[in-house]
UniProtKB/Swiss-Prot annotation:
Family designation: Belongs to the GatZ/KbaZ family. GatZ subfamily.
Subunit note: Forms a complex with GatY.
Function: Component of the tagatose-1,6-bisphosphate aldolase GatYZ that is required for full activity and stability of the Y subunit. Could have a chaperone-like function for the proper and stable folding of GatY. When expressed alone, GatZ does not show any aldolase activity. Is involved in the catabolism of galactitol.
The protein's name: D-tagatose-1,6-bisphosphate aldolase subunit GatZ
Keyword 4Fe-4S recorded: no
Keyword Translocase: no
Pathway(s) the chain acts in: Carbohydrate metabolism; D-tagatose 6-phosphate degradation; D-glyceraldehyde 3-phosphate and glycerone phosphate from D-tagatose 6-phosphate: step 2/2
Biological process per Gene Ontology, one example term: D-tagatose 6-phosphate catabolic process
A cellular-component GO term for this protein: plasma membrane
Length: 420
């Protein structure tokens, strides 16, 4: 990460896409997409997804590392080219506890990530815990971030410190997109970004972390990008120029969250304006979902009724029976909630892919379609971009490859934005 940031600060147009997903097909796509390039791939886990207690994936940081490396071995991607990151490392999962208890768990969380070899660490202590004022004072956020940084430094080896990089900042959009309709978004003001940096510098120095400050590579800000279930707030470069000019006076870049669904031209503008780390998650699993739905429609027409997977019906039934991952985000009312379950840009389906019933139905669908020749006309109907690539000889009409290429469409836009 440090080399890439140094190149950006030296004037090169270069950035990196941060893949925030634990879905094996998304990780496989990210690695396979760059297999024949010289670029490194940044894959990040969030604190609620992967933590010392297992998170909602059931994986510790060490488990997640081995999970990613196993996929890399399968793809033929050198693990030395993988950068592992930890996102929102702090009290996020334990906000219902008092600050002392939550921070104690957060310290162990950060240590677990660093011990597992994660080298990009987002120190995020911005969330209020039980009994805390809402919002927290910037000084409190910075002091807690310094405690987390001290934890990271205490377990990092000398070799790890050479690679270790930190991201600070509190102005993060709702992880995974907004829960309600949006029309506009507040862009971070320069004075707020400057105050974030100033308070963190003071807190780090007070804890003897002056050297660790040199490892802070980025500040999280809101450049004016966001999405909800069916709306996208697109990047307006002219609105972010004050931010772009301010960061040029520092040795850092910006990290932009919720950049999903922007145009490839917007990604290029974001990187030009020093938002050099672009995080993406739901857009990748949304593309996966589109591919699975398309293949399910194809299966519906090609496979005998008694042999079909019933994939779409299974997904719908499981999500209606177990609504904990979407209920507080989606609209009420049967019809509206069904539309959101299927098509929301927030893509809460991503939490359900590991469910045994859904996993089994998708596997059945894939086996069914691997055993037949899919007519080109059907691929044109349901996956038109992939049809064009089959026609040009770039792609085969194999279900797995069709899913991969659908995810590649998202990665292609980021590559256009980030490539030197």
């Amino acid at each position: 990460m440090k080399t890439l940031i140094a190149r950006h600060k030296a004037g090169e147009h270069i950035g990196i896409c941060s893949v925030c997903s634990a879905h094996p097909l998304v990780i496989e796509a990210a690695l396979a997409f760059d297999r024949n390039s010289t670029r490194k791939v940044l894959i990040e886990a969030t604190s609620n997804q992967v933590n010392q207690f297992g998170g909602y994936t059931g994986m510790t940081p060490a488990d997640f590392r081995e999970f990613v490396f196993a996929i890399a071995n399968k793809v033929g991607f050198a693990r030395e080219r993988i950068i592992l990151g930890g996102d929102h490392l702090g009290p996020n999962c334990w906000q219902q506890e008092n600050a002392d208890a939550a921070m104690e768990k957060s310290v162990e969380l950060v240590k677990a990530y660093v011990r597992a070899g994660f080298s990009k660490i987002h120190l995020d202590a911005s969330m209020s815990c039980a009994g805390d004022p809402i919002p927290l004072a910037p000084e409190t956020v910075a002091e807690r971030a310094a405690v987390l940084c001290l934890a990271a430094e205490s377990v990092a080896t000398d070799c790890q410190r050479e690679q270790l990089s930190y991201v600070i900042g509190t102005e993060v959009p709702v992880p995974g997109g907004e829960a309600s309709a949006i029309q506009s978004v507040h862009i971070t003001q320069v004075e707020d970004a400057a105050n974030t940096l100033r308070t963190h510098q003071k807190a780090f120095i007070a804890r003897g972390l002056a050297e660790a400050l040199t490892r802070v590579i980025a500040i999280v800000v809101q450049p004016g990008v966001e999405f909800d279930h069916s709306n996208i707030i697109h990047y307006q470069a002219q609105e972010a120029q004050a931010l772009a000019q301010w960061i040029e006076k520092t040795k850092m870049v910006y990290e932009a969250h919720s950049t999903d669904y922007q145009t490839q031209a917007a990604y290029r503008e974001l990187v030009r304006d020093h938002f050099a780390i672009l995080k993406v998650g739901p857009a990748l699993t949304f593309a996966l979902r589109e591919a699975v739905f398309a293949l399910a429609q194809i299966e519906q027409e090609l496979i005998a009724p008694e042999n079909r997977s019933g994939c779409l019906a299974v997904i719908e039934e499981v999500m209606l029976d177990e609504p904990q991952y979407w209920k507080k985000y989606y609209r009420t009312g049967f019809h509206d909630s069904l539309l959101d379950i299927r098509y929301s840009l927030s893509d809460r389906i991503r939490y359900y892919w590991p469910h045994s019933r859904i996993k089994n139905s998708v596997e059945t669908m894939m086996v069914n379609l691997e055993g037949v020749d899919i007519p080109l006309g059907m691929i044109s109907q349901y996956l038109p971009k992939q049809f064009e690539r089959i026609q040009s000889g770039e792609l085969s009409a194999i279900p797995h490859q069709l899913i991969m290429d659908k995810i590649y469409d998202v990665l292609r836009a980021y590559r256009y934005g980030c490539a030197e």
